[in-house]
Amino acid sequence: MLHHVGIEIAPADIEAAAGFFELIGFERVEPPPTLSEFTWLEHEGTQIHLMPEDEPTVPSPGHLAVVAPDFDAAVARLRDAGFKVQPKREHWGKPRVLAIAPGGHRVELMAAPPAAQV
């Protein structure tokens, strides 16, 4: 089971990035006191740790894939917030889109997890 993904991000982009992940179903959680400079978000036991870094590593061409509990509503919230949402070819008979989060990280939003379709 995946516990968390740590993402380096410029301090000026932390709030925007946290807002992006909140739009797709994550909620902020309190990090331990020793990591109070980080912003943590969680959804169904999986966490995203936004780690402030003055010179963040250039985002990789890879991506993070997230299953949205209410796919259509999550896509609408992203669009309403001004994010470009690019539909991708369907796999497993369910829709998916790609969006770029603040900081340049690619995030795939899926309507259903692959395991549910196998």
Question: What does each model-identified segment do?
Answer:
Residues 8-47:
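Core segments of cupin and vicinal oxygen chelate
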Residues 38, 47, 65, 96-98, ...:
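Short hydrophobic/aromatic beta-strand element in the GNAT-like acyltransferase core
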Residues 19-23, 77, 103:
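Structural preference for long, well-ordered alpha-helical segments within the folded cores
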Residues 1, 56-61, 91:
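Short glycine-enriched loop/turn motifs at secondary-structure junctions
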Residues 62-83, 89:
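Mid-chain, well-packed structural core segment of small domains
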Residues 8, 65-69, 100:
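Short hydrophobic/aromatic beta-strand micro-patches
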Residues 81-118:
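Vicinal oxygen chelate
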Residues 1-18, 62-64, 115-118:
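N-terminal beta-strand motif that seeds the catalytic metal site of vicinal oxygen chelate
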